[in-house]
């Protein structure tokens, strides 16, 4: 297997492929998540294998020392010097289960989950449908609303619709939501391209920026309130973990505030 490192262990240990990196805007946070997962899996039971997804979607078994790199670009530069490429059709021979540490598009939206199901490889986390619905903010809001849960007023814009009549749509949105309102891509995470809009002049630039990331954009009423995170483990008898509140440091909590040590605050 070349110079790529594996944790020496008896064959009875479960081989866990920790997939990190990826092709989304959140690949740096994925590196942080992958490091944490790799370090915290009990080595007496599991054999963690660091698997890096490069910017073109290829998979590589990387040396453990690569996990200490500061950025995914640093890892990608050295893939030909110590890492081993894993063809997707060979992945099942390398692992017993995949722990998905990918963030954002093609990692949390059901795409990678569906690929693993086609390859008949078990994985940790939500399935294809739940992942896809969770990433699509418009569909998630519709489902929550059907269950009687309050959601902010939302308008969805397609790129074709906006291109055909940006001025008319801007007037309609201002009449419907007023200011401030919030503009965001429909299928991005970690506050990517999320903008608080406080005036008519700010609306079109915010929408254009959101369209750089997705072909669908949401415009929502602005709601000031707490942001709470609560993880849930299991399906038949789900266990809700202790919730935490994210303490805001700005109007919009961005990726660094939510994930990077020392940048944000939770209680």
Question: At which residue positions do the language-model features occur?
Answer:
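Basic phosphate/pyrophosphate-binding loop/patch that engages nucleotide-derived ligands
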Residues: 143-151, 209
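Structured loop/turn residues at beta-strand edges in well-structured enzyme cores
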Residues: 93, 149, 177
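Phosphate-binding site of ATP-dependent enzymes
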Residues: 195-267
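ATP-grasp fold ATP-binding core
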Residues: 144-145, 173-192, 214-224
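ATP-binding N-terminal substructure of ATP-dependent carboxylate-amine bond-forming enzymes
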Residues: 1-129, 133-139, 146, 157-171
């Amino acid at each position: 297997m070349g110079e790529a490192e594996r944790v020496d262990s008896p064959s009875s240990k479960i081989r866990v492929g920790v997939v990190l990196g990826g092709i989304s805007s959140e690949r740096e946070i994925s590196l942080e998540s992958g490091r944490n997962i790799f370090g915290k899996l009990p080595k007496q039971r599991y054999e963690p294998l660091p698997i890096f997804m490069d910017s073109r979607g290829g998979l590589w078994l990387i040396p453990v020392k690569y996990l200490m790199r500061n950025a995914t670009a640093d890892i990608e530069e050295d893939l030909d010097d110590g890492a081993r490429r894993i063809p997707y059709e060979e992945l099942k021979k390398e692992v017993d289960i995949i722990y998905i540490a990918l963030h954002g598009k093609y990692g949390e939206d059901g795409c990678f989950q569906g690929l693993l199901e086609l390859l008949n490889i078990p994985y940790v986390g939500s399935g294809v449908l739940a992942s896809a619905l969770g990433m699509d903010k418009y569909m998630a809001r519709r489902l929550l609303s059907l269950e009687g849960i309050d959601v902010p007023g939302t308008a969805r814009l397609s790129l074709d619709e906006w291109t055909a009549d940006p001025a008319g749509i801007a007037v309609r949105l201002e009449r419907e939501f007023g200011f401030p309102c919030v503009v965001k891509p429909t299928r991005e995470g970690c506050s990517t391209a999320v903008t608080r809009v406080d005036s008519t002049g700010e609306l079109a630039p915010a929408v254009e920026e959101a369209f750089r990331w997705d072909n669908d954009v949401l415009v929502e009423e602005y709601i000031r309130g707490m942001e709470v995170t609560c993880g849930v483990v299991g399906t038949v008898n789900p266990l809700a973990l202790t919730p935490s509140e994210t303490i805001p440091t700005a109007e919009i909590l961005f990726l660094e505030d939510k994930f990077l040590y020392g940048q944000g605050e939770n209680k």
